[in-house]
Amino acid sequence: MTNLRKSHPLIKIINHSFIDLPTPSNISTWWNFGSLLGVCLILQIITGLFLAMHYTADTTTAFSSVTHICRDVNYGWLIRHAHANGASMFFIFLYFHIGRGIYYGSYTFMETWNIGVILSFAVMATAFMGYVLPWGQMSFWGATVITNLLSAIPYIGPSLVEWIWGGFSVDKATLTRFFAFHFVLPFIITAMVMIHLLFLHETGSNNPSGLNSDSDKIPFHPYYTIKDILGLLFMLMTLMMLILFSPDLLGDPDNYTPANPLNTPPHIKPEWYFLFAYAILRSIPNKLGGVLALVFSILILMLFPALHMSKQRTMTFRPLSQCLLWVLVANLIILTWIGGQPVEYPFITIGQLASISYFCIILILMPTTSLMENKLLKW
């Protein structure tokens, strides 16, 4: 009699994905972030579901309903802060996951990579709409500023903005549709994650050496299940410390003021995980130019397979490219800092320089460095 996990049509799929999956024996902790992102997604869906049971998507009661969740619902404060800080953890892991893909040349798995980029867009859209739901000052003005950017699209822009708003300003209709989209998108993301994994398992995982590892594979369980559980414990510990000790550390105090269309906050800024893109948007004085730069700052990830000039897949044995990648990381940290600063000298200039260097490093310096390394190795 064959083993049930190998013969049952449904369990067989799980077995081939998480138990008997042949995995390279040398993948490092950088490969843990995929599973951590999966855990974050499940956590967000569960906490979000419980929040949706008590939340009302109406401009008059939205802010009060969030207050009610925190004050009156059993462990509502915990669920709310787990959801808000869970989003921050999600983005930390997402950026690490993308960074690992760039460092180790995982973008050569074209389908997996491109679906991953689309996934990151979907996650960003979901997070943006979620930020609007508490209907605080930053929720309202953030929604107004970001949706207004679509008016920069030639000819159809202004009509498109009013169509998204459901009126002539961000109001009840906007909040209702944002709640609907925020609720449904995570399930679409889950389906896309499955496609992401499907394509990954077609090729098998990459590894730190970048070499073919078919001759040296080990089963996923128990080796990597244990390794993933360790990562999960670290994640839960960090998340619980954040929730229980300083739940508002990453939030904006302005969002504790109910939305008021007649009073603009002095500094409108998104959540910390969007600040780098926001800094790029603000660094261009032209509205359409800024919007294009904003979109392209993420869409540029799709160009990585085309910009790969090295004869080696990973950066493991390429010190010059490694240095350049860490310069890019430092650049992104500077952009994140600038995004949270007011629009005045010297922040404007720093933001413009950091934005130019962001695109220059990816489009010019990284490919030329790769070609130079090929020459140095006489390839």
Swiss-Prot record:
Family indicated by similarity: Belongs to the cytochrome b family.
Protein name: Cytochrome b
Species per Swiss-Prot/TrEMBL record: Proechimys guyannensis
One example GO MF annotation: ubiquinol-cytochrome-c reductase activity
SUPFAM superfamilies: a domain/subunit of cytochrome bc1 complex (Ubiquinol-cytochrome c reductase), Transmembrane di-heme cytochromes
One protein family per Pfam: Cytochrome_B
Cofactor needs: heme b
Subunit structure: The cytochrome bc1 complex contains 11 subunits: 3 respiratory subunits (MT-CYB, CYC1 and UQCRFS1), 2 core proteins (UQCRC1 and UQCRC2) and 6 low-molecular weight proteins (UQCRH/QCR6, UQCRB/QCR7, UQCRQ/QCR8, UQCR10/QCR9, UQCR11/QCR10 and a cleavage product of UQCRFS1). This cytochrome bc1 complex then forms a dimer.
Amino-acid positions noted as binding a ubiquinone in the UniProt annotation, renumbered to this chain: H201
Annotated Gene Ontology cellular component terms: mitochondrial inner membrane; respiratory chain complex III
Cofactor binding annotation: Binds 2 heme b groups non-covalently.
Residues that coordinate or bind heme b b566: H97, H196
Note: Heme 1 (or BL or b562) is low-potential and absorbs at about 562 nm, and heme 2 (or BH or b566) is high-potential and absorbs at about 566 nm.
Lineage, broadest ranks: Eukaryota, Metazoa, Chordata, Craniata, Vertebrata
GO term, biological process aspect, one: mitochondrial electron transport, ubiquinol to cytochrome c
Gene: MT-CYB
PANTHER family named among the record's database cross-references: CYTOCHROME B (PTHR19271:SF16)
Transmembrane segments: 33-53, 77-98, 113-133, 178-198, 226-246, 288-308, 320-340, 347-367
Subcellular location: Mitochondrion inner membrane
Keywords per UniProt: Electron transport, Heme, Iron, Membrane, Metal-binding, Mitochondrion, Mitochondrion inner membrane, Respiratory chain, Transmembrane, Transmembrane helix, Transport, Ubiquinone
Residues involved in heme b b562 binding: H83, H182
Stated role: Component of the ubiquinol-cytochrome c reductase complex (complex III or cytochrome b-c1 complex) that is part of the mitochondrial respiratory chain. The b-c1 complex mediates electron transfer from ubiquinol to cytochrome c. Contributes to the generation of a proton gradient across the mitochondrial membrane that is then used for ATP synthesis.
Topology within the bilayer: Multi-pass membrane protein
